[in-house]
């Protein structure tokens, strides 16, 4: 808490709050991580003295982000018994509370490496449909694990490829409607997750026939808006998530946002539009960046991220 005494010679505003954040975050590192707020956070104090009845509050957590190191990913997954997905040493994600996830990052930042980790951990707890426009590591992972994958074929155009994706998305939307009817009859009905994984979303929407692109966006929008209660989830990967890659309404439904690689005002503007990354201590190295988990368990503020380091079967990555 920072308790200003009024009247004061300085203005108590957002600029003051951010200056104190910069000082406190550097001074408390690495024992504590001060969580970045988009604007000043005031709380009332239990006192009758009007001069000190309010304080600036700075949310924080003990320690700093630490990378998880897994010597054998397959063995690690087989030993797991819960739906928790470990992200870092002191951060796990309950997949039952996930609606949609997004992983963004520039080329070579480690997006595919992070995606392979999530795919391996999701396989025991979710059905998977993988869309891989690059025909790269997600396809190799899917082949090894015998999972459905949609990838480009030599004798088909890009519009044919996106039309095939639309057909699968339409089937998933029908599944949502079926599950909604089942929930209407029995509100306690439990479903297994169905996760639709789309790598390089931007590659699908750019240069595609407008009617097919509009149908693709419409299906994505409906699945993102309706899939939460019926456990139909999206896991989207792209270099950036501007309005050309996914509709704004889909981006607003994302409750796990991951930005990997170079962090600055331009790179975070789509997943974290209100965030000024100044002052956030982001470690150097591959697979580092920011993560935001929006649920009732984690602080909604953005946290520094170090993606797990793991070892898996040769030939997948």
Predicted regions and their residues:
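Short acidic, glycine/proline-enriched loop segments that cap or flank alpha-helices
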Residues: 8-16, 185-189, 242-245
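Short helix/loop segment immediately N-terminal to the Walker
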Residues: 180-195
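Long, basic/Gly/Ser/Thr-rich N-terminal segments
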Residues: 1-58
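Short hydrophobic "helix-edge" motifs at membrane interfaces and signal-peptide entry regions
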Residues: 122, 189-190, 307
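N-terminal helicase ATP-binding lobe
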Residues: 34-50, 61-84, 202, 209-213, ...
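Conserved ATP-driven motor cores of ASCE-family P-loop NTPases powering translocation/secretion/packaging/pilus
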Residues: 15-24, 238-315
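Structural motif
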Residues: 102, 193-198
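P-loop NTPase catalytic phosphate-binding loop
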Residues: 2-4, 56-181, 202-255, 259-262, ...
